[in-house]
Amino acid sequence: EVQFVMTSSGVLTSKSIQLDVGSEFALGDNARPFAVGRSVFFSAPRGSFTSIKRYFAVADVSDVKDADDTTGHVLSYIPNGVFDIQGTGTENYICVNSTGAYNRIYIYKFLFKDGVQLQASWSHWEFPKADKILASASIGSTMFIVRQHQGGVDLEHLKFIKEATD
């Protein structure tokens, strides 16, 4: 629950390395933090629900770190039990999987320009109640989903297309 900043005076060696506390933010135990661009997203349980926070370096001050609560406006949206956070900078999103809603994939879409967030939204994809999303991950513009359903387990993929028009 403590984030460290590693520094060194001169060449990095075992004698010159220094670790200083950079910040302190509570985080969940089950989902590994996930980096997209200059941000790292992580989960933090809050009551019966989970916050997803974005850890970042404050503009032009690389030693100062902070975290935004991306779910601050939807406090009761993602149930506890987050076990996976994945995403891609190609399409600017993260996906979150939770044991509290195995049949859903929560999606956080965002757009930054010149270090300023222009847009952000939370949504979810809901699969049949009996289904379980076991994993989801992205490579470029394609999301891969491992979904367990009554007929077995499938590896599925969805393509996101940047600059698509309706």
Residue map of PLM features:
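Beta-sheet-dominated scaffold domains
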Residues: 2-166
